[in-house]
Amino acid sequence: MRLYPAIDIRNGQCVRLRQGQFHDVEVYSHVPANIAMQWEGQGASYIHIVDLDGALAGHSVNDEVIKEIVQTVSVPIQVGGGIRTIQDIEHKLNLGVNRVIIGTKAVENPQFVKEIISTFGADKIVIGIDAKNGMVAIEGWEKVSNYNAVSLALEMKELGVSTIVYTDISKDGMLQGPNIEHTKEMVDLTGLNIIASGGVSSMKDLEELDKIKVSGVIIGKALYERRIELENATRLFEQ
């Protein structure tokens, strides 16, 4: 099980939101690249970046910061937030990012997913499914759709997708533990590589997720608040 330390970027800074609320922000660092270096130093084998401004604006906003992170660390990086066009994807990959996460666009236009998988390959494209009580949320979490998350994942699988970041937004940034039940459903019913995200607060949460066979876990606030020591966690779960 791979652990992905999360770096959320807003106005060029490393921040955390509570439950995806853009007005509820905590700033952790003015230099996100330093944070990336810190996580790499503690054993991170992959880093997860979200351009929060991008997610809201619908186009890339913090590319300079992302580029700086890519140039600072040697581990691979995945990026999400505001990536909606083929040009966006090309641009991100040209910055040196290893793979991109597509969210809203996948819900709105499955044909686009098919196209980008055939253009870039399934290893470069991750689909982000954000859900609230099993239903898909879109547009930077501002709207909840009438799409069931598992159905959407299965539809993506048909299109050639192999990896999904599954976020339960009722849990995100709240440190209340992940939604094991819905995540397990995702793993069992889709057979895809599921990267769990949202609510991870302790080593116990990581054990629970490891048991249900997720392929990875994104850890945010719990790392910043030292509830999980990345070095220990990596040693336990990535070996």
Swiss-Prot record:
Molecular function per GO: 1-(5-phosphoribosyl)-5-[(5-phosphoribosylamino)methylideneamino]imidazole-4-carboxamide isomerase activity
Keywords from the named record: Amino-acid biosynthesis, Cytoplasm, Histidine biosynthesis, Isomerase
List of catalytic residues: D8 (proton acceptor), D130 (proton donor)
Catalytic activity: 1-(5-phospho-beta-D-ribosyl)-5-[(5-phospho-beta-D-ribosylamino)methylideneamino]imidazole-4-carboxamide = 5-[(5-phospho-1-deoxy-D-ribulos-1-ylimino)methylamino]-1-(5-phospho-beta-D-ribosyl)imidazole-4-carboxamide
GO cellular component annotations of the record: cytoplasm
Metabolic or biological pathway: Amino-acid biosynthesis; L-histidine biosynthesis; L-histidine from 5-phospho-alpha-D-ribose 1-diphosphate: step 4/9
A Gene Ontology BP annotation from the UniProt entry: L-histidine biosynthetic process
Pfam families, sorted: His_biosynth
InterPro entries: Aldolase_TIM, His_biosynth, HisA_bact_arch, Isoase_HisA-like, Isoase_HisA-like_bact, RibuloseP-bd_barrel
Signal sequence interval, chain numbering: none
Subcellular location: Cytoplasm
Gene3D superfamilies per record: Aldolase class I
EC numbers on record: 5.3.1.16
Name by which UniProt lists this protein: 1-(5-phosphoribosyl)-5-[(5-phosphoribosylamino)methylideneamino] imidazole-4-carboxamide isomerase
